[in-house]
Amino acid sequence: MSENIQSVRGMNDCLPDAADAWQGFEAIVRDWLRRYGYREMRTPILEHTGLFKRAIGEVTDIVEKEMYTFVDELNGESLTLRPEGTASSVRAVIQHNLLYDGGKRLWYSGPMFRHERPQKGRYRQFHQVGVEALGFAGPDVDAELIVMCADLWRELGIAPTLQLNTLGDHGARQRHRSKLIAYYEAHRDVLDADAQRRLHSNPLRILDSKNPAMQALNAEAPRLLDELEDEALNHFDALQGLLRANGIAFEINPRLVRGLDYYNRTVFEWVTDQLGAQGTVCAGGRYDGLVEQLGGKPAPAAGFAMGIERLLALVETSGKPIVPAVPDAYIVHAGDTADAFAWQAAATLRGAGLAVVLHCGGGSFKSQMKKADASRARYAVIIGDEEAAAQQVSVKPLRGTAEQTRVELALAIEYLKKA
C-alpha cells in the first residue's frame, strides 16, 4: 500500500462541519459590509514579489522571513503568494483606475500565506476579511472603520479590546527615528540580535518586539506621540472624540506600531486574551502614502483586516457559536413508484427555495430514517408507493414533538416554509 499524502504543515483542510460555520460567518460578514456600503473585489493570490517588497517594506519580518516566493521557470519572474491583502487591493485600484470618480469603499476575503511556525490561531495558509476605504482623508472614516468593527463584534457576541495609536506624519517619524536610534545605541549591550539588525534600518520595528527583555527596554523608549505635529495631533484627537461619541472604549498604546511599513497616522488593533496568550483578531489604520508609493496618483486611504480562523475560535469561546445552516428536509422513499416521484418531489421543493437532501442508496424506511435524523434536517419527507400514487407526501418533524402529517406536494412547500 502506498504512503498516504498529508496536507502541507500549517495548511488545513476545512471539513463539512467547519465549513458550515464558515459559511454562517461569511453570510453575517457579507450582510454587515453591505449595510455599510462596501463593495467586494477579488484579486489573485499570486502577485509579483516586488509589489510586497515595495508596499510592506523590505526590512520587515513578512518580507525577510515569511513570504512564499519562487521564480517562474517560464519567464524568470519572481512571484509570491500574497501574505496580506492591502497591497493587492491597492495595486488593483491603481491598475484599473478605480479612483477616477472619487473615493471607494471596498472589501475582500480569501486565503493569505506566510511561512511562520504553525500554532493555535496562526497558520501558514490563513484567511482574512479586509476592508479598504480609499480617497477619504478625515478622521471620520477612521472612526467608521472602528465603529463598524464594534458592530460586528456585538453581532458575533464577542468583546475584544481596542488599542489605538498614531504614527503621525513623515517628519514626526523621522525625528522619532533619530531619537530611537540614539536611545537604543545607548543600550546596545542589551539589544537582542533582531534589534541589533534593525537598529539603523528600521528602529520602529524594535518597538514591536515580542522579547520580554526588549519589551522592558521599549517601555522607556522615546514616544512618537511626543513628536506629533499639529495636523496629525488634531486628526488623532478628532478620532478619539468620534469614538467616545459613538460609545467605543479604547486604550492608547504608544508602542503599537504594526508590522507593515505602509502605515501612517492612525493604527489600531482589536486584541483578546480569550484564546490563551493575548492575540490580535483585527488590525488596521491609515496608509495615505501607499497609493502613490505603488505608482498611482496621491490618495488617502485606510483599512483593516481580520483573521477568520481566530475570529471563529473566539466566537466558539463566547458561548454563542454560529449556528450552521441545516437541510429543510430529507426525502425518504421506497418502492418503484415512490422512487420516481421522489425525484419530482425533490425538484419541486428545491424550486421553491427549500434545501432538500434526496436519499440515495436504497434501504429500508427504518435505515433511511436514521440517515434523515443524522443529516440534521428539520423534517423527513416520506414517500411510499401509496403517497406517490396520490401525488402526496408524509411530513415528519425530526425535532420536537409535532405529529407526522400527510399533505399534497404543493401544500408541503407551505408547510415546510412556515415551520
UniProtKB/Swiss-Prot annotation:
Q: Where in the cell is it found?
A: Cytoplasm
UniProt-listed Pfam families = HGTP_anticodon (PF03129), tRNA-synt_His (PF13393)
Per the record, the major location class is cytoplasm
Record's Gene Ontology CC terms?
Answer: cytoplasm
Which InterPro entries did the record assign? aa-tRNA-synth_II, aa-tRNA-synth_II/BPL/LPL, Anticodon-bd, Anticodon-bd_dom_sf, His-tRNA-ligase, HisRS-like_core, HisRS/HisZ, HisRS_anticodon
On the tree of life, the source organism's domain of life is Bacteria
Q: Name one GO molecular function term.
A: histidine-tRNA ligase activity
- Which portions of this protein are annotated as coiled-coil regions? none
Q: Which GO terms describe its biological process?
A: histidyl-tRNA aminoacylation
- Does this UniProt record's set of keywords contain Mitochondrion? no
Query: What is its EC class?
Result: ligase
Q: Which UniProt keywords apply?
A: Aminoacyl-tRNA synthetase, ATP-binding, Cytoplasm, Ligase, Nucleotide-binding, Protein biosynthesis
Which Enzyme Commission number(s) are on file for it? 6.1.1.21
**Catalysed reaction equations from the record:** tRNA(His) + L-histidine + ATP = L-histidyl-tRNA(His) + AMP + diphosphate + H(+)
Q: Which Gene3D superfamilies match?
A: Anticodon-binding domain (3.40.50.800), Bira Bifunctional Protein, Domain 2 (3.30.930.10)
Could you say which protein family the record assigns here? Belongs to the class-II aminoacyl-tRNA synthetase family.
Q: How does it assemble?
A: Homodimer.
Q: What is this protein called?
A: Histidine--tRNA ligase
